[in-house]
Amino acid sequence: GLGLIGGSMAKSIKNRTAHTVWGADLNSETMTMARMCGAIDAPLTEENLPQAELILVAIRPGAAIEWVRQHAPLISKSAILVDLCGVKRTVVASIAPVAEQYGFAYIGGHPMAGRERGGFTASTEDLYVGASMILTPDKRTDMRLLETLKAFFLDLGFAGLTFSTPEEHDRIIAFTSQLAHIVSSAYVKSPEAQRRRGFSAGSFQDMTRVARLDEDMWTELFLDDEDFLTKELDELIGHLTDY
């Protein structure tokens, strides 16, 4: 995927390393832009996929799981696959057995960076500078794999790696990311939002920066993390009631 996350990965890799980048996106216009600006060297195809040494899957959780299942037979046993999805329990539980079956290395990941806009046109080569890269290794993860990924992500400008279980990731992300988007989106639904001109400043801008959501993507993320997110919503409602 070459949206905000995948596109920024591609641009960062091309600008900060000597690696060859192959990319794929369902949007033909995105593919054209990616090639024209040099974010990718060539399209990722079934012909060159077996040669890929590191595969970054930057699409929605359900689509990521399906893509790996469909393409697993083509992935080299010496390759490393990292998903970049915003939830980890469902993704890791689905992809890890496939990776084990076909013999390639897999680890769940989540770059802690983003913008209020999505898509390739919003992607930048410096999106990950100073950010944290979350990885979810398990007891079978080879330490040499972690060292390889650490060097790779530091080259892209990440400040460091954060290690977590899928469960811990989803529990904390429900608070630090998902809840924040819900609060921002709910906040701007007040009728007064239409009458704010001349009455708003920095605090309003801060509260509303991430109010516009990609409905399909965020619905999937919210539903995959329903238990932890519901708990955080209940906690917030309780504190609002206190006020």
Regions found by a protein language model. Name each.
Residues 1-46, 50, 54:
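NAD(P)+-binding Rossmann beta1-loop-alpha1 motif at the extreme N-terminus of oxidoreductases
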Residues 69-121:
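Rossmann-like NAD(P)(H) cofactor-binding subdomain of soluble oxidoreductases
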Residues 29-30, 63, 88-91:
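Conserved short alpha-helix immediately C-terminal to the canonical SAM/SAH-binding motif I
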